[in-house]
From Swiss-Prot:
Bifunctional enzyme with both catalase and broad-spectrum peroxidase activity. Keywords: Heme, Hydrogen peroxide, Iron, Metal-binding, Oxidoreductase, Peroxidase, Plasmid. It comes from the Bacteria. This is Catalase-peroxidase. Homodimer or homotetramer. The gene is katG. One of its GO terms (cellular component) is cytosol. The record marks 95 as: Transition state stabilizer.
Amino acid sequence: MDGNGIGSTGKCPVMHGGNTAMGTSNTDWWPNALNLDILHQHDSKTNPMGPGFDYRRALQGLDVTALKRDLHALMTDSQDWWPADWGHYGGLMIRMAWHAAGSYRTADGRGGGGTGNQRFAPLNSWPDNVNLDKARRLLWPVKKKYGNAISWADLIILAGTVAYESMGLKTFGFAFGRADIWHPEKDTYWGAEKEWLAPSDSRYGDVADPASMENPLAAVQMGLIYVNPQGVNGEPDPLRTALHVRETFARMAMNDEETVALTAGGHTVGKCHGNGDAALIGPDPEAADVVEQGLGWMNHSTRGVGRNTVTSGIEGAWTTHPTRWDNGYFDLLFGYEWELRKSPAGAWQWEPIDIREEDKPVDVEDPSIRYNPIMTDADMAMKMDPIYRPIAERFHRDPAYFSDVFARAWFKLTHRDMGPKARYLGPDVPQEDLIWQDPVPAGRTDYDVAAVKARIAASGLSVAELVSTAWDSARTFRGSDMRGGANGARIRLAPQKDWEGNEPARLATVLGVLEGIAAETGASVADVIVLGGNVGVEQAARAAGFEITVPFAPGRGDATDDMTDAASFDVLEPIHDAFRNWLKKDYTVSPEELMLDRAQLMGLTAHEMTVLLGGMRVLGTNHGGTKHGVLTDREGALTTDFFVNLTDMANVWKPADANLYEIRDRRTGAVKWTATRVDLVFGSNSVLRAYAEVYAQDDSREKFVQDFVAAWAKVMNADRFDIA
């Protein structure tokens, strides 16, 4: 027999090659091997829409007025299978949108609501997202009706925004343009814990110091969006919680005023659910039985819906009128003294010591019954923290100001990961430019590109100087939140001009020349920087025997200091760059893993990463002019020498120091070159070696140049949403 059980009574009569629950994977055998999967996500093999589908074009056929009308109607169309609290789904839809957008973190730009990732694991099954599967299922008839003209990503955020409008808030605006993904994201690190809601301590150097939370995380526990509503590790202490609220919201790009506004505005409507026994709740959607059809947390033992729903375990509404936008949150927060109590589900919550009957919210099903309002530990932080309280008091005194600040903060929360305003679509896009959008003015397109290139070529700047400067300007781009990139030429502004990774002294010299050329020709500095890199690449290709023109589209603008929130760019500072063979310091994560992470953020595939790194090495662009990995005696020529010499068995590779290796002549033992781990991994990893061997072949010299130029142009244009 062949071991597959074919022909054996009682055994599985199918091959096990495609079985998802059995067998041993490569990752099981070699858990520490470099995993390139994060570079191979979201391609045509998983996307059912086909290569010709363009969501931005599909949006042009969307009847936005009709869609919003249908969403308004949905809010009060209660369904028996999941009844609306007080007959209004607004609170549920807002929580869905909040928890989609609120997973964003500034450190790497990942998370957020820009991809519809809440539909997939792990987010669809997070403890903090209990019963949001019901919100998305309630939206399904709307999605079904409008089809491909509206993505799930846009619909989820729009539903939350319309929910606020339906309850009386004048919102700041809304932009369409979020395209869906079709499988779970593999690149986002949510933490190392192996259990939901594991104690916070493992993700902090010291849990008493919120700033010591592990980067890039922005939530206090695995499976939460930001803080534990019952207190740090479930132990109520509003002043302690306030410190963690401040840190987690800062990691979501929010200042103190925005934090108070979002907390209060998010809790002005809706309620918490904990009127029942959490032990009766079934498994999450990913673990639920097939008969649940993608829903989770089902209660088949008791009623489990309406007033008997269990979600967070906390039970009650924050305000007297939970389906109405008003200032009731602050009225109750400051109007009463509060004490700790336990919910029916056993969760800690704050309730008023003594409250007028008319200030109590009514039952979600029977308006003749009233219950105490509640506050979470985070809500009490708004009252007790010495920084948050004055902000909350101002909001209490000035409801119009509160509404405006909240509307703006909600817009920021739900659009922060969309990138610049050029990506916004739809009739409700606000006219006002906001500094967190990293605005860039339009650049000229009517100048003589050939004349600019001629001036650059005659400037005396070397290939390495031109290519390095263009690369440093463009490499900040992150496909996660669409920030960074060459457009705007912010490399000449603080803080980028002073970043160690940009070699400030060298950068200032090169920029001095390029800025002069820009002034003389009418081109933007941003365009001239990119053109400089293109000129360098073309010169290097010519030195290798190939004439090629790097694609270029003029029109980049130059940002100013007034358009730049310098502090917000700190998270974009490169602390490593494998393409320029540089590490700011030693890290616990291996250099090759850091390389993969950066390549993924830049939107590169594995073969694009390979060809770019090999090309950058022979162009002599290493940080500080080091020679590590420069495996050529023709530096400055765009040759395949890096791959030829890396794969040459006439050489041997010996460790010389931490992250430093010597490449020696196998016969004589003479040192020929030095290299780092990110160089040698292209010969040691089986997949990367396969790519390296392609470019080392004798018939691949021209292919290498063509592939390098294509990948280079992709990096230079990654942020050109104005021409996409």
